């Protein structure tokens, strides 16, 4: 039972946490900057002593001792009003938004550092690109990214991000903006500066950069559909649509670059069966905006709770997941789609009452995952995890995912090499097991190449003359060398992973 079920009483101030409770909560936030502190607890199987375990345990204690009421916490990163139930957080922020009492939200890292978020702008539901037309839009950029794989089939983060940002500009702004990398840089600068003194200058630069695309919109893009929607209703114009386009581009860019890669990792380990469930699970488990702070600029009352101006409301859905009856280890239900919209804080935006641009970004991510998996099979190289033990945090920049061609078939009479160069590229900074996984993948590729060479040598077309027989011997010799190399690499990989 949440406070939403309680009868209204006279308004009163939120209860303050005790000094020891503040100290434990602060220590848990500081520890988020030290990922290695989880290693001893995980090695002993004591998940309750990890950073997230301690935080959730403290929140469960506060929820019991405060009857589920929001509590005022004091930390080295500032005082926060923390709702202890997801329903309470949603209700409190909705009431504040309705009263016009909220300043724009800022993001909060796990270690307590604040960062700018793209200012939320409503996006008309019927202005989004229809799902049926999204299938064709990502194809060209997905093919470019797949072609940019390294020799061992893995993806370089910079190449992946560059390709996904191209795709995002194509879908949101139009074909003319695909090569406009400066647009992405200006957008990133404006987003990071949100809420600071330099924001207006950066926002003006972003408006200038978007102006040509708004003046001559691509009808197949989100911008074209948004302007057509506004003109059909006699509303606004190109300049009025600029903030909505910028917000949608920021969210789609992040979903395509980060969430899609996480979804591919989930598919690789069998933690999701379809692109829709993979994207939904990635956004649920590792939301790009995992925590947000909402400054209150005017007094308001939510039920019997009086919230004063100057208060900062902290909303962290991940911490409350287990407390609200949803197990932290549960997966998204089969058939779930993040694009359908779910109650609670949008995973890509800190809007207090939902965000249509987030739903559109999730839909784009689903189509990108579908386009990738229609051509290649994702293989997780590092970090290592399994479907039944997914990590609490997963930085997409640390993911090493290999893409294996679906069309490659060993021993079919043709020489099949996935990529022109089959030289593995080391993953600097990873554990020996990660190098071992790369070596295993290289050994498998060498073995397949040896099999395809042997199958090619067995073709009857070489029987027609002396030159054919001589060339067959060359093929067989090369196949033998590849097989021997595969055995050697596999032995080395075994030593690395043992």
Feature names for model-found ranges:
Residues 316-352, 382-386:
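Conserved cytochrome P450 K-helix/beta-meander segment immediately N-terminal to the heme-binding cysteine loop
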Residues 225-283, 357, 365:
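Central I-helix of cytochrome P450 enzymes
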Residues 182-239:
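Cytochrome P450 catalytic core segment centered on helix I
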Residues 2-107:
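N-terminal membrane-proximal hinge/A-helix region immediately C-terminal to the signal-anchor transmembrane segment
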Residues 351, 409-498:
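N-terminal secretion-targeting helices of virulence/extracellular proteins
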Residues 74-78, 135-140, 147-170, 180-182, ...:
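Cytochrome P450
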Residues 359-392:
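Cytochrome P450 heme-binding "Cys pocket" and the immediately downstream C-terminal segment
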Residues 51-63, 273-305, 315-324:
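Conserved cytochrome P450 K-helix E-x-x-R motif and the immediately C-terminal K′/meander segment
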